[in-house]
Amino acid sequence: MELQAQLKQYKPLNQQQMNEFIELLIADDISNEIKANLLSSFSEKEITQEELTYISKSLIHSMYRQQPYYPNSMCVCGTGGDKSNSFNISTTVSFVIASANIPVIKHGNKSVTSSSGSTDLLEAMGINTSSVEATPSQLNQVGLAFLSATDTYPIMKSIQPIRKMMTNPTIFNITGPIINPFKLDYQVMGVYETSKLEKIAQTLKDLGRKKAIVVYGANGMDEATLSGDNMIYEVNENEATKNYTVNPKDVGLAYAPNEALIGGTPLENLEITKNILTGVDRSAKRDVVVFNAGIALYVAEKVSSIKQGVIEAQRLIDNGNAIAQYNKMGGMTYDYIG
């Protein structure tokens, strides 16, 4: 297979070849073993920034001739694959920032490398994922929609068994958060590899984000963490890329090890999320949520700095707005009791 030979030689693919690569992965007449070899070969090579844009566009265009758009919409997500076994930080963050009247369209999946992905947590909460068609109406009603990648992109469902066969993260850990079905204005995305920071930031800009931050969490997490300096690449549609670091002390939070953020099963993570949103949990788990929510509020232009965003995120939890947002979603309901 010519394409596989090119991948084995670590040669970059152009847009046409990337389209062919995606077509091979979804073809019914090709075995999972061959697909796994293709995916492994692609994931072993160092992807270029252009290739990342190409594959993202290939995936989007395989499903949508024109992406749907909802004004000022945002997604907060990580690539996964960091093997930290943390609780569902970005899903918890989504409730907080949606309570600030930011239309949140979170594009998630079942976990591949941990015990609970965002879709697993939603099932435990009794919250249904939305369809692309129903999302605008849901945003108008409750300001937050969760989309399952395996529903919005059939390729994600078809390659799920292949990804399960593989021991290491694949390119789809990276592209999954990038290819939100909606053409977003804002995005915060976490990665577990520093080599991907600038490439992903530029790709998000290529895909039309007005403002976005890509963050590498201290000590290898795919969220901003409390254990040290977090590396950030920030892109704006009309400005040059900025890169800098931010640590908990910079935004008024205490240091804590990444081990303090460990979660568990979907039901255990539900309890963690509930305790944060109701104000019961005042531990490092709450702090990491307000840290990441603060970054998101800054990206969505609700505040002028990450530190102000952290203060606002704390207020949204402490005044009961965050748990009220959760209760709007139609799952189990709780009161603020902090």
Curated annotation (Swiss-Prot):
What positions does the entry give for 5-phospho-alpha-D-ribose 1-diphosphate binding?
Answer: 78, 81-82, 86, 88-91, 106-114, 118
Residues given in the record as Mg(2+) 1 binding sites: S90, E223
EC id: 2.4.2.18
Please share the entry's free-text remark on the cofactor.
Answer: Binds 2 magnesium ions per monomer.
State the source organism's domain of life. Bacteria
Q: InterPro entries annotated for this entry? A: Anthranilate_Pribosyl_Tfrase, Glycosyl_Trfase_fam3, Nuc_phospho_transferase
- Positions contributing to Mg(2+) 2 binding: D222, E223
**Class of the enzyme per the UniProt entry, highest EC level:** transferase
Coiled coil residues, start to end: none
MF terms in GO: anthranilate phosphoribosyltransferase activity; magnesium ion binding
Cofactor(s) needed for function: Mg(2+)
Which Pfam family is one of this chain's hits? Glycos_transf_3
Q: Supply one GO BP term.
A: L-tryptophan biosynthetic process
Keyword list, A-Z: Amino-acid biosynthesis, Aromatic amino acid biosynthesis, Glycosyltransferase, Magnesium, Metal-binding, Transferase, Tryptophan biosynthesis
NCBIfam families listed in its UniProt record: trpD (TIGR01245)
Subunit composition?
Homodimer.
Q: Which family does it belong to?
A: Belongs to the anthranilate phosphoribosyltransferase family.
Q: Please identify the protein, giving its name as recorded.
A: Anthranilate phosphoribosyltransferase
